[in-house]
């Protein structure tokens, strides 16, 4: 089981690294901020799954009886946690760049639309009247309000995309954990037949397996309910 968790953590690290590289390329190319927000949501969900998997691996290593294996696994956990912190710092840096790109893009679009509207409203081109000078501060405050509103909507859209992607990743992680539990149960039952474990112990294992299934299906149901509520809210 410890090898399974180790391989799972390794795959998550590889997946996060690929996603961070993709996000970094998107930042350099100043790609669509919506697609970048989707990548951010995927990475956030992967970090949650990784942190939980490392904790599970650490908990299992503490119960290891062979000193050599326990020492080796403890070193692996330390390396995992250090790499986790490094990747998280890089992710925070890239998220800051994405926010800067989105704000600059929104500000540019609003200023462009504002200039276009002013050119249509003014029949005298670039000439400045006393009324326009008086109304200048009001126009600036209204423009600042539009910028703030646009930035808020952009952040809200990014958060919704991130939440949806996180829910999808959590659901996938639940499915994967269900498969791991099923495989573990099979191994335990085979070992029980070999070692002659009592029926009482087997019944406890079966009961725990049923509880895990209930938790899995309840979690999946809650995720689908959240998806439905978000869908209704977006409509």
UniProtKB/Swiss-Prot annotation:
Side of membrane Vesicular, spans: 235
Gene Ontology process terms (BP): endoplasmic reticulum to Golgi vesicle-mediated transport; intracellular protein transport; vesicle fusion
Subcellular location(s) of the protein: Golgi apparatus membrane; Endoplasmic reticulum membrane
Membrane topology: Single-pass type IV membrane protein
Transmembrane segments: 214-234
Single Gene Ontology MF annotation: SNARE binding
Superkingdom of origin: Eukaryota
Physiological role: SNARE required for targeting and fusion of ER-derived transport vesicles with the Golgi complex.
Family to which the UniProt record says this protein belongs: Belongs to the BOS1 family.
Protein name in the entry: Protein transport protein bos1
Species the sequence originates in: Schizosaccharomyces pombe (strain 972 / ATCC 24843) (Fission yeast)
Gene symbol of the encoding locus: bos1
């Amino acid at each position: 089981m410890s090898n399974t968790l180790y391989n799972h953590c390794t795959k998550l690290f590889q997946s996060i690294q690929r996603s961070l590289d993709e996000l970094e390329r998107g930042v350099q190319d100043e790609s669509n901020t919506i697609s970048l927000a989707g990548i951010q949501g995927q990475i956030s969900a992967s970090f949650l799954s990784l942190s939980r998997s490392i904790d599970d691996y650490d908990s299992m290593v503490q119960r290891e009886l062979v000193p050599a294996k326990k020492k080796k696994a403890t070193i692996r956990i330390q390396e995992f946690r250090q790499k986790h912190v490094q990747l998280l710092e890089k992710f925070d840096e890239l998220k800051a760049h994405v926010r800067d790109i989105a704000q600059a893009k929104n500000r540019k679009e609003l200023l462009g639309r504002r200039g276009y509207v002013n050119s249509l409203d003014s029949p005298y081109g670039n000439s400045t009247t006393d009324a326009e000078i008086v109304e200048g501060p009001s126009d600036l405050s209204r423009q600042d309000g539009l910028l703030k509103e646009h930035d808020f909507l952009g952040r809200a859209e990014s958060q919704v995309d991130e939440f949806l992607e996180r829910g999808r990743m959590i659901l996938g992680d639940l499915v994967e954990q269900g498969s791991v539990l099923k495989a573990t149960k099979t191994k335990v039952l085979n070992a029980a037949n070999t070692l002659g474990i009592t029926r009482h112990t087997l019944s406890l294992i079966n009961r725990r397996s049923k509880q895990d299934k209930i938790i899995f299906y309840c979690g999946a149901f809650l995720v689908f309910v959240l998806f439905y509520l978000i869908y209704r809210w977006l409509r």
